[in-house]
Amino acid sequence: MYWYVSDVTQHDFHSTINIISRHSLDHYKFFGTRWRSFIDQGIWEVSSETFWCLGLPYSDMARVDPAFFAELKASPLVIFKGDLNYRKLVQDRNWKTTTSFSEALGDFSPVVLLALRTCKADTIAGLEPGTAENISKQSPDWMVSGEYGLIQFNSGQ
């Protein structure tokens, strides 16, 4: 299985923070400086582990890279952004939309995480009964249109 990743490199991330920190507008400068302090203090960490680019769902991480899985499991919160990461979180399966997010995470469910996603693929889990049906009445292609988004939290329990 192949994945297309359009996200940033570590260099891009740090360069962007530096540019924002030096911006002429104070509110940009405020956030850039604050974000830089989060990185410097170890509150935020950007990871470039090899597993991120493997053609595997995150539910395989404990088996394939147990040390990295243990590191994420020990983190107070791991934030995932993007449709591809969401697909890898829920194993890119055609879940019933009301399947719990935790169940869809499979063996990755012990990780405390927040998933931020614009819906661009027809896989989703953790919706309340009737939600998908109601949205489908208004927008039949809502799961792939990029016009809808989703924020989901997993407590790791």
Question: What is each model feature region?
Answer:
Residues 2-157:
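C-terminal functional extensions of proteins
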